[in-house]
Amino acid sequence: PGGNDSEYAEFFFSIRGQMLNNRAAANRYPDGKEDFKNIYGDWFAYNFGVKDGYYYRGAFMDCVQAVRFMATRETSDMTQLFAEGSSQGGALSYAVAALSDYPFTAIAPCVAFLGDFPDYFNIVSWPAETAKANKGSMTNEEMYAFLSYFDTKNLATRISASVIACSGLQDVTCPPHTNIAPFNNLPTEDKVFYYYPEMGHEIPADWNKKIMAFFKERMK
């Protein structure tokens, strides 16, 4: 949706240390005195192996809190919630629908990150190399047990929303299998997956049109 679309109350936000939360004070307001900084370094590596302190635990909770904030707005209809995002945002779409206090109507994850880690790490080198460099004394079995808490394949089992998802078959950042795994675990029968044979890690030109049509068909 856009700012002039009266059917939606749209909330765009950034998780900790990223984008809006990683910029100079002067870029936030004219007399700003405090910079917003990424204090986490490599997000995937931050507190790796610490289940309660890992970066993506906090990032997922940022999404949950964003929904709680929306619930305080008079313009929000909390019976009709939608989420969409690509790459990391695709993973966050799965996470917020799985963990939110409020059920989502539909979500649209595209070329989603954080899916099916054991196979993910066998397919491509990143983020496998980062994980293995930061796993310390953990065995591979222990590492995958830790990562299972943040795996979209497992989060998907908690989602009741309708889902429209997509993947590029040439994607070497978030390969197709890592997108198909969570999609297959979704309990809903109201789900559709689009494959783009020539596409890499990118958003299809027609994607926004597709997801908005999907969302509008499911509005109450």
Model-derived regions, located:
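Gly/Ser-rich "nucleophile elbow"/oxyanion-hole loop immediately N-terminal to the catalytic nucleophile
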Residues: 42-87
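Active-site nucleophile elbow and catalytic-triad environment of alpha/beta-hydrolase enzymes
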Residues: 140-155
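Short alpha-helix in the alpha/beta-hydrolase fold that links the catalytic acid
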Residues: 161, 175-184
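Cap/lid segment of the alpha/beta-hydrolase catalytic domain
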Residues: 2-61, 119-126
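Short beta-strand/loop motif that positions the catalytic acidic residue
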Residues: 159, 165-167
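C-terminal catalytic histidine-bearing segment of alpha/beta-hydrolase fold enzymes
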Residues: 180-220
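Acidic catalytic loop of the alpha/beta-hydrolase fold
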Residues: 169-174, 201-202
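Hydrolase active-site cap/lid region
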Residues: 92-139, 203-206
